[in-house]
């Protein structure tokens, strides 16, 4: 009997594709990425689509892009595609080795020093390029672990780690459970508990991964916590990977403390076990340039990562431009100050708007997002209830926010909402939508039911007509 067309297609796929290509570890079906799809299908626009989905699920720092644009206008020689810079075209366009342009790695090392307050020095010879922080994280994991090995990761953590750290490496991520009762702070007790669980399951634990500043919390790790964690990893002879890609987004005190400071202060810590991931995507707002950095204190890791970097090099044209820019000390200093100022102002304005509506966020001082507490809106403290609320916000309120479950949060009802990738008008419209949503929610609580405009039975918040008139008023 002939096979159906779909059966033939499935059969061919199972034969042709590798196990890697057909596994489900990438994480693209997570609500985190589903929210992006909702935005892509109906993107908000101030002129062309006022009722579209507002993108608040993308952790981009667009508040100071104008400063970058102005610098580029003033420095045409930085680009090999201008009359002023064409003299460098032949040298830059030719094949380069995997170490990167010397002027680029030197500039990166200097920039890492500046974003850490000048308290530590970085060696340009230890700077290894990668295709964004995604490539840098995967490169490190491939250097440090084998398939089946595991890394401890505090929750909540960046959803992309499932792709970056697990998908192609076969490495496991073991959660360190952090709770809202202490503002999701990492404790040694929680680390020890996660470590013991891994040991009991006969899992080989190779290291611990930190994001500092934290995505999605927007908080930083204090010096004492970093010391305790580095002592723990040192005593257990496991690696400590510190993802510091948000280092320059700290906009309020306390100041950022890099793991590099900690190991410089404590000679008992084995530096060979400590590694840093850096990037320009968040600090400068260059996610499209795909500039990721592996910085390791371990010579063998540096050498191995450099070999692997051939699969994800930063283009020499990009290196050339950034070497010019990051070597402009006056500009970099002014940019970092102004960027922090704008992030602080946007954070304060956005969280104040939420607070006026009755929504609280975890207090934070870094990053480009807030950790929003919507637990009071859940019908029950379950994952299903969180997903129902999230779908309501996506489909009816038309805001792409990310549910806490996609960050492996140990508690339901928390959502990450990004505030630095939209302009002021769009932010005001987003707040207006949230306000109307909360009014509708409060009306339900008061009257017991909210009518669905189509069938009168109830549970759908159809706010679009109200939003349309409100947004026109905001834009007037």
Curated annotation (Swiss-Prot):
Keyword hit for S-adenosyl-L-methionine: yes
Catalytic activity annotation: S-adenosyl-L-methionine = 1-aminocyclopropane-1-carboxylate + S-methyl-5'-thioadenosine + H(+)
Listed GO MF terms: 1-aminocyclopropane-1-carboxylate synthase activity; pyridoxal phosphate binding; transaminase activity
GO biological process per UniProt: amino acid metabolic process; ethylene biosynthetic process; fruit ripening
Tree of life domain: Eukaryota
Residues recorded as bearing N6-(pyridoxal phosphate)lysine in the entry: 282
UniProt similarity note: Belongs to the class-I pyridoxal-phosphate-dependent aminotransferase family.
Assembly behavior: Homodimer.
Protein name per UniProt: 1-aminocyclopropane-1-carboxylate synthase 4
Species per Swiss-Prot/TrEMBL record: Solanum lycopersicum
């Amino acid at each position: 009997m002939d096979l159906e067309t779909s059966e033939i297609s499935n059969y061919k796929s199972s034969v042709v594709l590798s196990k890697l290509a057909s596994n489900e570890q990438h994480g693209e079906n997570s609500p985190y990425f589903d929210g992006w799809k909702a935005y892509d299908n109906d993107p908000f626009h101030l002129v062309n689509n006022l009722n579209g989905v507002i993108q608040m699920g993308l952790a981009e720092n667009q508040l100071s892009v104008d400063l970058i644009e102005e610098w580029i206008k003033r420095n045409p020689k930085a680009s090999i595609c201008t009359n002023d810079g064409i003299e460098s075209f032949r040298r830059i366009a030719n094949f380069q080795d995997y170490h990167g342009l010397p002027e680029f790695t030197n500039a990166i090392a200097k920039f890492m020093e500046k974003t850490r307050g000048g308290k530590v020095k970085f060696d340009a010879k230890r700077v290894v390029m990668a295709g964004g922080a995604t490539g840098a994280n995967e490169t490190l994991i491939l250097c440090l672990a084998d398939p089946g090995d595991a890394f401890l990761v505090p929750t909540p953590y960046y959803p992309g780690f499932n792709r970056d750290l697990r998908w192609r490496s076969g490495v496991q991520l073991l959660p360190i459970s952090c709770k809202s009762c202490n503002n999701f702070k990492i404790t040694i007790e929680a680390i020890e508990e996660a470590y013991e669980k891994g040991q009991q399951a006969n899992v080989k634990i190779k290291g611990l991964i930190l994001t500092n500043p934290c995505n999605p919390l927007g908080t930083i790790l204090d010096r004492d916590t970093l010391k305790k964690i580095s002592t723990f990893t040192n005593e257990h002879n496991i690696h400590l990977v510190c993802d510091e890609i948000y280092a320059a987004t700290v906009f309020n005190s306390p100041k950022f403390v890099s793991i590099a400071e900690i190991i410089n202060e404590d000679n008992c810590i084995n530096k060979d076990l400590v590694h840093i991931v850096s990037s320009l995507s968040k600090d400068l707002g260059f996610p499209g340039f795909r500039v990721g950095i592996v910085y390791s204190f371990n010579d063998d890791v540096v050498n191995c990562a450099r070999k692997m970097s051939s699969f994800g090099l930063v283009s020499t044209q990009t290196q050339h431009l950034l070497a010019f820019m990051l070597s402009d000390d006056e500009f970099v200093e002014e940019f970092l100050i102004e960027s922090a100022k704008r992030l602080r102002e946007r954070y304060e304005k956005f969280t104040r708007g939420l607070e006026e509506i009755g929504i609280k966020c975890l207090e934070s001082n870094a990053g480009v997002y807030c950790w929003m507490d919507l637990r009071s809106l859940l019908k029950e403290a379950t994952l299903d209830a969180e997903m129902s609320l999230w779908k309501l916000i996506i489909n009816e309120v038309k805001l792409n926010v990310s549910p806490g479950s996609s960050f492996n949060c140990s508690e339901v009802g928390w959502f990450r909402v990004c505030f630095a990738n939209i302009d002021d008008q769009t932010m005001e419209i987003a707040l207006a939508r949230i306000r109307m949503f909360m009014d509708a929610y409060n009306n339900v609580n008061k009257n017991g039911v909210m009518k669905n405009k189509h069938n009168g039975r109830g549970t759908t918040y159809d706010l679009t007509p109200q939003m349309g008139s409100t947004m026109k008023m905001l834009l007037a």
